[in-house]
Amino acid sequence: MVVVDDIYINDEIILQSVKKFNIDKNEINLLLGIGGSGSTKRVPSKIFINFMEKISKIKKCRFYLATGKNSGEQIILNEILQSKYKDACFPLDDLSIKEILPIIKNCNLSICNDSSFSHLSAALGTKTITLMVDTPIIYGNYNTKMFPVIPDGEETVKHHTSGKDRINPQKIFDKALEILN
């Protein structure tokens, strides 16, 4: 049994996940937590796609897309799945949490809206870039595995910051490289 911050996953389950979902450890496996509990917390797909373009130029990547089933989240998911990166994407919205947790544990890095997936990822011990757009910064930096990115033009974030369109993909990319290297 591996103890990972607050969530425990058996080593065998982690290895089974690698086989079941064809997780290639020679690639950079990234969880993209594209969902969010409200529309003001969901960074637009174009920002994720811009980041995907930047990171794909220098590293072979596999993107695990974590989101819920509501229509706003599904729009973001489908826009990403219709991009040129669709073949490098694996949507998680049809899987159970029990199946998703070992996938997250196998990721090199998570990049998530301030959503349940950012909290799960950090609790699993996976370094997590939290995209803080509309909630207090403490929600995205209370864990040592969390690395917040805030909207351009802001020094901090709080409720009603309304910054989802001002998350800079270059900042995400720079932070990802810093963490991955």
Say what each PLM segment does.
Residues I47-V133:
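Donor-binding and catalytic core of enzymes assembling or modifying cell-surface/extracellular glycoconjugates
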Residues M1-K41, S45:
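Mid-sequence helix-capping/hinge segment at a functional interface
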Residues I9-E12, S96-I100, G153-K158:
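A short acidic, often aromatic-flanked loop/helix-cap motif at beta-alpha or helix-coil junctions
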Residues D6, T40, L92, T161-K164:
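Pocket-edge positions in alpha/beta enzyme catalytic cores
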Residues G35-S37, G68, G140:
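Short strand-loop junctions, especially beta-strand C-caps/beta-turns
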Residues H119-N181:
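Nucleotide-sugar donor-binding patch of glycosyltransferase catalytic domains
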Residues K20-F21, I103, K175:
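CheY-like receiver
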